């Protein structure tokens, strides 16, 4: 009786392992079943699920749309092997945003590649298609404001870091667009590349950059770091007691945008 009730409501997804070769952050090592395993899981899930889905993830900040077509092709191989057409296909996340050294193709090219891959499945009726836009949807909506606590030549020690909102600037080495908040003082037109160091005791609290800022930046200056609407607030910890929960809503434009043909070229890194 319990199994019958579950059968009426249960939605199961089998996550398929696909290549993350074009992603800045590889998410393929922990999750995902190879094609032969996924086929067996799909057959098993068919016995119990009300809705059955296949999903994949091409990795975070995917820089080439072809990855989605390749993922859909793997889905097609599983469908051919099992003769089971899923109710849902989830093409996952990975949709990119723009950073100074990472300029993706227009978002429409990603959608075109997905549609092409789905068409190549040659199914009489397509399943429901879902996706998980993250960075591409919300990255531009948030910034972090940091204070320069100390300058040592081209090293800036700031009051946030990899244990705070700037995790992606650490190990993945994402370079955020940056600009000094002038606050009434004269800012040099000469630019210099800087490394950042966070406030904690850990030497890993380091952000290589390069972060391009005016040469005359000094202690107590404030810097805006953009593209932190995704994975900024969610990564904060209270390690060493450093934690900021001050959030303000403003209505100015983002430092960079991928949804405007006139991209702000002064923030791009060659």
Predicted regions and their residues:
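Solvent-exposed alpha-helices and their adjacent loops that cap or buttress functional pockets
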Residues: 4-7, 23, 46-48, 90, ...
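Active-site-proximal beta-alpha core segment in soluble small-molecule metabolic enzymes
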Residues: 1-88, 113
